[in-house]
Amino acid sequence: MRSVSRPGAIVFALLFVLESLARATLLTVIPLQAYALLGEAREVSLLYVLVGIAGLASSFAIPLLIRRFRRRRVYVLGAVLLIATAALLATRTLAGQAVAMLCLAVGTAALNITLSLYVMDYIRKRDLVRSEPLRMGFSALAWSVGPLLGVTLYEKLGHGSAELLSACFSVLLLLYFAYLRLTENPAVAAATRPIADPRANIRRFVAQPRLRLAWTIAFVRSVYWSMFFTYPPVYLVQQGIGGTAAGLLASGGNVLLLAAPLFGRLAGRTGLRRPIMAAMIGGGLMCMLATIGYHLPVLVALCLLGGAVGAVILDALGSVPFLRAVHPYERPQMTTVYRTYIDLASLLPAILYSVLLVFFDLRAVFVTTGLAMFSGALVAHWLPRRM
């Protein structure tokens, strides 16, 4: 009982599971509904661009909110925004879709930043290589079942059903968080620097080579997942296969998260550099193979699942370089800058994809993602051997 009621790796993993269930239930529904409302893959990309810009700008306000209202209330705000996301999506209007996607982006940022701060307060640096894969492994069920369950409800019971289930998971998250009554580590809170201008935080982040390296690795990882959860569903619908297959593909990629603890143990023996580089190279190769077999949907799906293996390895290990490198006294500021990889990995590729899709089909998306993975492998070569 103590393991689920006192701050530690299991408690933080359970919080992430409930958050993941709320988000994963809508994971495939969001791009499918956007495609149904807009009718073109390029228009879907443009919607993601606009939401990404707004979400990125909003995320820089989170340290100010944490300082003004404290971390606990900002976490609650993030969960409430997930509930708002579900309610707005249920309207099945373009305006509701756009605002829902923005609420999801800001809510996810609030939850991600505050949970990362709690993890750094309570988990020792040498234990991160075990606790982070454990968190991902715990969430495997959510990300495996959620996308398929959500799209099945969406197609069989109609709009509103998947959204209702997502909102219920968000309510459970709020109740569990209230039960835990988490507090900030007083020693760390006392050492935290005052909130500076966001531009000063960015300059401070960029001035630290290890933080730049950690951000790049996380960015490339998120580029793959952003592609995987957005464009393959559109591709499968274009091929006449349907939304259920898209849900199966998303769930199949996420079930691989069950292996995350194994990758954590592997990194404990070999270090981070080799498995991270291998994951990126393998993911890039799978994207290129998907491009070659573009007119064979089953082959494309299998290749993208193969690439998801590499992305799961990066999920298990990719956050560890940042968590080990960041200084305790500037965690809120640096965490906010670091997690911009999530918004930028959706925003920047979406801008590029919007241009490419004017001239090419979805093969251009797969090729671009593969090149990003190869580039990430080159950057990961600079990871210190002892990290």
Language-model segments: residues:
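Juxtamembrane intracellular "pre-TM" segments in multi-pass secondary transporters
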Residues: 1-6, 184-216
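Helix-loop boundary and gating motifs at the non-cytosolic
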Residues: 2-52, 210-249
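Hydrophobic core of transmembrane alpha-helices in multi-pass small-molecule transporters
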Residues: 17, 96-110, 219, 298-313
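Intracellular juxtamembrane helix-capping segments at the cytosolic ends
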Residues: 30, 110-123, 313-326
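Helix-to-loop junctions at the C-terminal end of transmembrane segments
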Residues: 58-70, 259-272, 357-358
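Structural signature of the two symmetry-related core transmembrane helices
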Residues: 73-87, 167, 274-289
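Cytoplasmic helix-loop-helix junction between adjacent transmembrane helices
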Residues: 104-139
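Symmetry-related core transmembrane helices of the 12-TM Major Facilitator Superfamily/SLC fold
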Residues: 162-179, 366-381
